[in-house]
């Protein structure tokens, strides 16, 4: 709250059309405190144009009454971290919920009146067969969420899973399995009416995540809390990671910002590439000031999965599999 207050002298520089409560377990926050945050935002900033307010809700952590309460505050989108419907896989990933919690929380959200729900799923997991992944997708489709995020597993350092893989107690799937599960996801969800609008994201008509689209299109954003990152087109800055140190700074009425970076023209150019190629709509070349047409033509010839036309460069669905390599080719 105090950090939000600290921006009151710069409030007129910011315009928002989305709000996102994430970065942990915001669904555990009592509705009255969530309301206080929204009231504080309203008192400092002009949020009259906000159309999407998302809250992350982990399965098993949000009761029906709580969901009804947050819905009444104006929260109109939920994002649920299902990850899997296999309890063995959930345990392997270090998740605290069970498969049945996913269904219960989802149905409670529907009862509470939510008609815009995202579900996060993960593939490329040790022990997750093609058959099991198809089964997960089938169960998910039965729930019929408006939005689905499907990510290939990234094993983070300092986790139990990382140590198991490092010590060869678990083997990560071979690349062929990762690719096949990605393509299966695209095929099944597209046939069910989901638009594959970003590498890892699928949405029903007009249900794309506006908040994340703002990130990928490099719109300015302002974030609050430990580790929060912000961006104003010219620079990025981020807060202290430690909760204890963050609270200590705020209690002393000191700035919790840990560091910042000024973005060069090269940085901005490369970030348009990095983020824009993730989107099925691709990149408007006119946004790339000083782009090298010869290099674009060269990449168009090199990669069959790259499409260049009408001042647009974008990837096919198969092209998403090579996005890192193509991005490197386009960087300056």
Task: Give, region by region, the residue ranges found by the protein language model.
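A short, conserved structural fragment
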Residues: 302-311
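Short phosphate-engaging motifs
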Residues: 157, 295, 322
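Minor-groove-contacting beta-hairpin "wing" of winged helix-turn-helix DNA-binding domains
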Residues: 312-316
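C-terminal scaffold of the Radical SAM
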Residues: 1-10, 14-289
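Short amphipathic alpha-helical interaction segments
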Residues: 289-303
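Short, amphipathic alpha-helical interaction segments positioned at domain boundaries
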Residues: 318-332
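Intrinsic-disorder/low-complexity regions
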Residues: 135, 286, 309-310, 328
């Amino acid at each position: 709250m105090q950090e939000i207050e600290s921006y009151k002298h710069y409030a007129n520089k910011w315009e928002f059309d989305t709000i996102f409560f994430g970065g942990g377990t915001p669904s555990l926050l009592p509705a009255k405190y969530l309301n206080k945050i929204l009231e504080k935002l309203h008192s400092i900033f002009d949020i009259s144009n906000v159309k999407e307010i998302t809250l992350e809700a982990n399965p098993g952590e949000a009761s029906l009454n709580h969901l009804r309460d947050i819905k009444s505050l104006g929260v109109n989108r939920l994002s649920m971290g299902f990850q899997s419907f296999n309890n063995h896989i959930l345990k392997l990933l270090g998740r605290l919920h069970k498969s049945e919690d996913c269904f219960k929380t989802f149905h409670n959200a529907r009862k509470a009146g939510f008609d815009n729900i995202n579900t996060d799923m993960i593939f490329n997991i040790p022990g997750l067969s093609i058959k099991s992944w198809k089964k997960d997708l089938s169960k998910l489709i039965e729930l019929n969420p408006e939005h689905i995020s499907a990510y290939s597993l990234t094993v983070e350092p300092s986790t139990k899973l990382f140590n198991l893989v490092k010590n060869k107690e678990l083997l990560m799937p071979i690349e062929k399995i990762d690719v096949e599960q990605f393509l299966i996801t695209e095929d099944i969800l597209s046939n069910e009416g989901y638009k594959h609008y970003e590498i890892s994201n699928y949405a029903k008509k007009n249900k794309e995540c506006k908040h994340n689209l703002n990130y990928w299109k490099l719109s300015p954003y302002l974030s609050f809390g430990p580790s929060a990152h912000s961006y104003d087109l010219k620079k990025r800055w981020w807060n202290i990671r430690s909760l204890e140190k963050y609270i200590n700074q705020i209690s002393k009425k000191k700035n919790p910002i840990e560091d910042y970076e000024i973005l060069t023209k090269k940085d901005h150019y490369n970030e348009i590439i990095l983020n824009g190629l993730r989107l099925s709509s691709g990149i408007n070349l006119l946004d790339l000031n000083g782009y090298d047409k010869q290099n674009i033509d060269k990449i168009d010839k090199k990669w069959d999965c790259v499409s260049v036309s009408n001042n647009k460069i974008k990837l096919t669905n198969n092209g998403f599999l090579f996005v890192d390599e193509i991005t490197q080719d386009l960087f300056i």
